[in-house]
Regions:
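RNase H-like (RuvC/DEDD) metal-dependent nuclease/polynucleotide-processing core
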Residues: 2-9, 13-293
């Protein structure tokens, strides 16, 4: 595992509608050292442009994307309980979403969240909650969670259900558009742990940027680094040189920068590739968040 990766890419993702997005941010940290750097795109990134980059990665690249690579499955043995078309595993889920959204522009996922059956599993707004958003015996009204998300709570972070499409916590849209990307990477980029960690070739993992920030010393509940000074404090903890700049910094850029530096620090550590609670079945269906033990 030593020196398996020498290039570390972090992508702060967005599921918003539209062609270009200032909220998508890419950062790269080189294994030989130096500060992480933002890959500039002044007009905002298009999802198709990010896909093109991912399809042309050097072999020893580790990519972390801030999205969910799967949906809850272990809690009731299905992504969409009661739906005859519910896929059997994560790769079939990606393919189903991409198929249903084939006519959506900009790799969006509007058709899936408006699908007559799939829509029933999502919270669409404060007053529009699908009848399948909660399981009948759900202990809370937060929606369903994957095993890795329940484990994240043990780390002190607060993940949101991937079936939630509401407001700033609408991780569901980011995950759905991301799954369209993942479906198009099949056979070209390994997606851990849904794919086994290969001996060579680029690898993509799911990231929760709060975990990276906490790795840089950020306190629980205060993981958004909204100034160059706060970012550089975290980078110092991660053994990285500082980035240039002072004053306010948008959190899309800071999330990507601190995550790239964190991936460089831990990406070649075998312990991070063997989470205690990850089973073959969970890997095949729900996936896992890199950095969750």
């Amino acid at each position: 595992m030593v020196d398996r990766f020498d290039r570390f890419v972090a992508i702060d993702w967005s599921g918003a509608r539209g062609k270009r997005h200032k909220s998508i941010s890419l950062a790269v940290a080189d294994g030989s050292g130096g500060p992480p750097v933002i890959v500039e795109q002044n007009k905002g990134w298009a999802r198709e442009e990010v896909l093109a980059i991912l399809l042309d990665l050097p072999d020893r690249t580790l990519v972390g994307m801030d999205l969910g690579i799967g949906l809850p499955f272990a809690d009731c043995g299905a992504f969409f309980p009661g739906w005859s078309d519910s896929p059997a595993d994560a790769k079939a889920l990606w393919a189903l979403i991409d198929q249903i959204c084939a006519d959506d522009p900009n790799l969006e996922a509007t058709s899936f969240v408006k699908h007559p059956v799939a829509s029933c599993y999502y919270r669409h707004s404060a007053g529009d909650c699908g009848e399948q958003f909660h399981l009948p015996d759900a202990p809370t009204r937060e929606g369903r969670f994957r095993v890795t998300e329940r484990a994240q709570r043990d780390q002190g972070v607060r993940p949101v259900s991937n079936f939630n499409l509401v407001g700033a916590a609408q991780v569901g849209k980011s995950s759905l558009t991301g799954m369209r990307i993942l479906n198009r990477l099949r056979g070209k980029v390994s997606v851990w742990p849904i794919d086994l960690l290969p001996d060579s070739g680029p690898v993509l993992v799911e990231m929760y940027t709060s975990i990276a920030a906490m790795g840089g010393g950020a306190r629980k509940g205060r993981t958004k680094l909204r100034s160059y000074e706060a970012l550089n404090e975290a980078l110092a903890v991660l053994g990285s040189p500082p980035v240039r700049g002072s004053g306010p910094l948008d959190d899309h850029s800071s999330d990507a920068l601190v995550t790239a530096a964190w991936l460089r620090k831990v990406g070649n550590d075998p312990r991070y590739w063997h989470p205690e609670r990850l089973t073959d079945e969970i890997a095949r269906t729900e996936g896992w968040t890199f950095g969750v033990p």
